[in-house]
């Protein structure tokens, strides 16, 4: 069994659920995840890559925590991504957030810098540490760090 635990920092929504059991992803739970990780600015829902959930499960397991991930940003519509690109530094034009393959998080009760180190040690996908904003970006793209 693999589970997820999320608290969305912008909407206050929470989800703790088993998303994989008996050798299969649980479609109903994946739909709940898609909804919680939607673009909260536009309310647009998009499929979240199950491999991203697996990455988060492994990250939480490796740090030895059962705390919820605090979600800063997950799926972003193209409109939201463009708005953020114009108003912020470090937002990619072709962000993996627009594909449901990236998430920005912190883990309750765990130092964010250390979370980034552990995420990099998994050697899976991209990992960005944003110290000033106190979050870690992880995605299911090619392995890279910033």
Give the label of every model feature segment.
Residues 68-82:
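Acidic helix-start/capping segments at beta-turn-to-alpha-helix junctions
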Residues 55-60, 77-80, 105:
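Cysteine-centered nucleophilic/redox motifs
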Residues 2-7, 87-146:
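Catalytic cores and adjacent binding grooves of peptidoglycan-active enzymes
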Residues 13, 65-69, 123-126:
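Loop/turn elements at helix/coil->beta-strand transitions in domains of secreted/extracellular proteins
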Residues 1-31, 142:
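Intrinsically disordered, low-complexity
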Residues 17-18, 83-85:
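Short, solvent-exposed loop/turn and secondary-structure capping segments
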Residues 26-28, 80-83:
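Short acidic/His/Gly/Ser-rich catalytic and metal-binding motifs that mark active-site loops
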Residues 21-72:
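Active-site acidic/histidine clusters and adjacent loop/turn architecture
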